[in-house]
A protein has these predicted regions:
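Acidic, Ser/Thr/Pro-rich beta/coil linker or hinge segments at domain junctions
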Residues: 300-359
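Glycine-rich phosphate/pyrophosphate-binding loop regions near the starts of catalytic domains
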Residues: 14, 22-177, 183, 188, ...
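Helix N-cap motif at beta-to-alpha junctions
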Residues: 285-290
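Short amphipathic alpha-helices in soluble, non-transmembrane regions
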Residues: 292-302
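N-terminal amphipathic/basic leader segments beginning at the initiator methionine
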Residues: 1-31, 330-332, 347-355
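Active-site-proximal betaalpha loop/short-helix elements
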Residues: 20, 107-109, 201-277
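Short, ordered loop/turn segments at secondary-structure junctions
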Residues: 18, 65, 105, 137-139, ...
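Short Gly/Ser/Thr- and Asp/Glu-enriched loop/turn motifs at secondary-structure junctions
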Residues: 43-45, 275-280
Length: 359
């Protein structure tokens, strides 16, 4: 009799499984990995790293699909988002984004002006970092089959800084945050029909490679790096803790949150740590280099608020890094949040679905 691989507790896939938090991890761990895990080159990372022929360099590749609602938002649109999101996933592996593919799934009836505006936005972002389009595809589906427009991308880039991995955290590492958190998620909340919030808040949607390029060319020990998209900062830190069997301690006062983001969070009862970002990354770095790395990030407009927000206080010496392990079952794998009065609480792995169709 064939062994049953899955312990997935649902008979149908819940919306929360697309959140980038615990439910997403559960779906991947219980449905995908039992069947596909042995084929993955780079399990648990936003991009896989591979060698190509006789090239002296490795390459990073990432695929992503963008389904945001609304498709136009303060600070960008689905076109800009698709390039920035895919480019950033490759950059998080220490690579320079160089090539991209694009797949468009268009709902019948989408306005010509709307589509052209999105394509112009894509062209602007592609030109910004000199990306080359390798291939593209277009499908038009009957009205009601999808919501306006979905975009799939695959980005490829040459690795300039090797060894970056969520499994590579070391005891004593300093955790750096490149920018204020929550702007993308809060701005999408504010723009959704029915919520009725009026705000000047803009999404932080941006390509991060230009800010990170000096770090890739220098002699810096970057152990882990991740852009804080779905699930926000909380998801990134908990994924790192899980993968490296580490305890991470974060100083709440060091995390910069814009007042408008705080306002949206207070009105809706949200934690800014769990809101999506599209122009923010976290780094785990050699402690002696942390201050210099922060200064380099601050020299770029996207990193002007970069700061050290915490450190890795413990790493299990016997950990076997695998995203197939359950964070909740490992007491050493945790993220601790300290407030200004010295009290501590866990920064929980995001549960449920805060906001569907966020990116």
């Amino acid at each position: 009799m064939q062994k049953k691989h899955t312990q997935y507790p649902h008979t149908t896939i819940p919306l929360a499984a697309g959140s980038g938090g615990a439910a997403s991890d559960e779906l991947i761990r219980e449905i995908f990995l039992p069947h596909l895990g042995r084929f993955f080159v780079s399990e648990g990372e936003d991009a896989g790293v591979f060698s190509a022929g006789d090239s002296a360099k490795d390459f990073a590749i990432s695929t992503d699909s963008f389904v945001i609602s609304p498709i136009f938002f303060n600070g960008g649109d689905i076109g800009k988002l698709s390039i920035c999101g895919s480019s950033n996933d490759v950059a998080m592996m220490g690579a320079k984004p160089e090539f991209i593919t694009l797949g468009f799934m268009i709902e019948e009836g989408l306005g010509q002006d709307e589509l052209e505006k999105i394509i112009k936005s894509i062209a602007c972002e592609v030109e910004r970092t000199d990306l080359k389009i390798l291939s593209a595809d277009t499908k038009v589906l009957p009205k009601g089959s999808i919501d306006k427009l979905f975009i799939n991308t695959t980005c490829i880039g040459k690795v300039l800084k090797s060894g970056i991995s969520s499994k590579a955290l070391q005891k004593g590492d300093k955790i750096i945050l490149s920018a204020p958190i929550g702007a993308h998620g809060a701005s999408i909340f504010a723009s959704r029909e029915g919520i009725g919030l009026h705000s000047n808040l803009q999404s932080d949607c941006a390509q991060l490679y230009e800010m990170l390029e000096p770090l890739f060319g220098g002699d810096f020990e970057i152990h882990a790096m991740r852009d804080a998209t779905r699930g926000g900062l909380s998801a990134v830190l908990n994924e790192w803790a899980n993968a490296s069997k580490a305890q991470i301690e974060i100083d709440e006062e060091c995390i910069y949150i814009d007042e408008e983001v705080r306002g949206v969070c207070e009105i809706l009862g949200l934690e800014a740590y769990m809101l999506a970002n599209e122009g923010v990354c976290a780094l785990s770095v050699e402690p002696s280099q942390a201050s210099e790395i922060c200064e380099i990030l601050r020299s770029h407009p996207l990193g002007r608020y970069a700061s050290i927000i915490g450190e890795v206080t413990e790493v299990s010496s016997t950990h076997k890094a695998s995203s197939n392990q359950n964070l909740a079952k490992d007491t050493k794998a945790r993220v601790v949040l300290k407030n200004k009065w010295g009290s501590k609480r866990f920064m929980e792995y995001p549960q449920g679905e805060l906001l569907p169709r966020i990116c």
